[in-house]
Curated annotation (Swiss-Prot):
The keyword Transmembrane helix applies. Signal peptide: none annotated. The modification Phosphoserine is found at S351, S361, S364. It is a multi-pass membrane protein. Enhances the incorporation of serine into phosphatidylserine and sphingolipids. One of its GO terms (cellular component) is membrane. InterPro entries: TDE1/TMS. It comes from Rattus norvegicus. This is Serine incorporator 1. One of its GO terms (molecular function) is acetyltransferase activator activity. The modification Phosphothreonine is found at T352. It is found in: Endoplasmic reticulum membrane. Keywords: Endoplasmic reticulum, Lipid biosynthesis, Lipid metabolism, Lipoprotein, Membrane, Myristate, Phospholipid biosynthesis, Phospholipid metabolism, Phosphoprotein, Transmembrane, Transmembrane helix.
Length: 453
């Protein structure tokens, strides 16, 4: 009897595998909008891919992957073969994820509302989509080696560079929303408390940035060497100071009342992270000490004969993963009315659509059990670009690939090495990020005939 009830329970979920997103989540989650629930499911699927990629880097798993016929054939380089298998596995897994999201991005071009037949593919058919993704990933493991790893390294580097810039755009949006929320609460009541909170958050960000700069000069520079690191730290410090001063100039405040030091402090600490991440990719080990050596621990990891070592975990990579998760989930739930950011991310003003959706009672709600319902708030128009959202996840897959492999490149000499290319990609992205932030400050002054509200 129990088995029959169990089968009936499982059977009740079968329509959900081919139906809309709310059917999957609304049985265990509160009521919500279809647009938000769908994005969360895609983000959770990407998170599962990240977890699998992390598992593939575990030495025990690498030994199992090494049993795949021909996967690590004729690899007799300096770096152990099982390490190469781990990095290759991440490349192929992320290749499959990236191709899955790129395919959806191309399929969803110019979808205007949920009444478009392609919107049903975006918001439903989950079983078939996930099965397709798994099939693409499995197929990626049978791609002949050849130049695949080298070519995909450069593709991943370009995609990761673009995703870093998207991270910065979302970070600017988050900082603006954060500042606006606290300023509104400060004006409504208990102004001293909220003013102190705003000031404390700003001061903490700048304090952490200052501590980071001091540590960079202490551990990543030497009096007679490491001139590149000295230049990176100094230039980024001056750029952050300039952007912070610019954000509180009277002319900027007049045209951009929402600008302030809180946003600048968030951009500053993110720039310091990019600077640190870039310096940790330098090939010269004397200018790139490991975190364990900095804090005084002696490592006992095996080192090959030529001294080329491979570390399985990287602190800057862990921080990068945390930022990645925050970015993806924030982009999945954000309902910001910041018009500048919405234009950059091809997002509509969601508030009006939500209000319209909440006002409907006939056919607008996906009935669930009890009060668990989801609003189809995209019948009159999508609240975000389906195509751009999938393209962002495509770039996120490449960013994860580069982060988990620490931006290492597989050399023809069969060594896993850091590259100056990765250093310059990260440093240039930090510079472009500051330029983008400064542009959000000065754009209303330069383009006076345009509305930036």
């Amino acid at each position: 009897m129990g088995s029959v009830l169990g089968l009936c329970s499982v059977a009740s979920w079968i329509p959900c595998l081919c139906g809309s997103a709310p059917c999957l989540l609304c049985r265990c989650c509160p009521s919500g909008n279809n647009s938000t629930v769908t994005r969360l499911i895609y983000a959770l699927f990407l998170l599962v891919g990240v977890c699998v990629a992390c598992v593939m880097l575990i030495p025990g798993m690498e030994e199992q992957l090494n049993k795949i016929p021909g996967f690590c054939e004729n690899e007799k380089g300096v770096v152990p073969c099982n390490i190469l298998v781990g990095y290759k596995a991440v490349y192929r897994l992320c290749f499959g994820l990236a191709m899955f999201y790129l395919l959806l991005s191309l399929l969803m071009i110019k979808v205007k509302s949920s009444s478009d037949p392609r919107a049903a593919v975006h918001n439903g058919f989950w079983f078939f989509k996930f099965a397709t993704a798994v099939a693409i990933i499995i197929g990626a493991f049978f791609i002949p080696e050849g130049t695949f790893t080298t070519v995909w390294f450069y593709v991943g580097m370009a995609g990761a560079f673009c995703f870093i810039l998207i991270q910065l755009v979302l970070l600017i949006d988050f900082a603006h929303s954060w500042n606006e929320s606290w300023v509104e609460k400060m004006e409504e009541g208990n102004s001293r408390c909220w003013y102190a909170a705003l000031l404390s958050a700003t001061a903490l960000n700048y304090l952490l940035s200052l501590v980071a700069i001091i540590l960079f000069f202490v551990y990543y520079t030497h009096p007679a060497s490491c001139s590149e690191n000295k230049a990176f730290i100094s230039v980024n410090m001056l750029l952050c100071i300039g952007a912070s001063v610019m954000s509180i100039l009277p002319k900027i405040q007049e045209s951009q009342p929402r600008s302030g030091l809180l946003q600048s402090s968030v951009i500053t600490i993110y720039t310091m992270y990019l600077t640190w991440s870039a310096m940790t990719n330098e090939p010269e080990t004397n200018c790139n000490p490991s975190l364990l050596s900095i804090i005084g621990f002696n490592t006992t990891r095996p080192v090959p004969k030529d001294g080329q070592s491979v570390q399985w975990w990287h602190p800057q990579g862990i921080i990068g993963l945390v930022l990645f998760l925050l970015c993806v989930f924030y982009s999945s739930i954000r309902t910001s009315n910041n018009s500048q950011v919405n234009k950059l991310t091809l997002t509509s003003d969601e508030s009006t659509l939500i209000e319209d959706g909440n006002g409907r009672s006939d056919g607008s709600l996906d009935d669930g059990e009890g009060v668990h319902r989801a609003v189809d708030n995209e019948r009159d128009g999508v609240t975000y670009s389906y195509s751009f959202f999938h393209f962002m996840l495509f770039l996120a897959s490449l960013y994860i690939m580069m982060t988990l492999t620490n931006w290492y490149r597989y050399e023809p000499s069969r060594e896993m090495k850091s590259q100056w290319t990765a250093v310059w990609v990260k440093i240039s992205s930090s510079w472009i990020g500051i330029v983008l932030y400064v542009w959000t400050l000065v754009a209303p002054l330069v383009l006076t005939n345009r509305d930036f509200d």
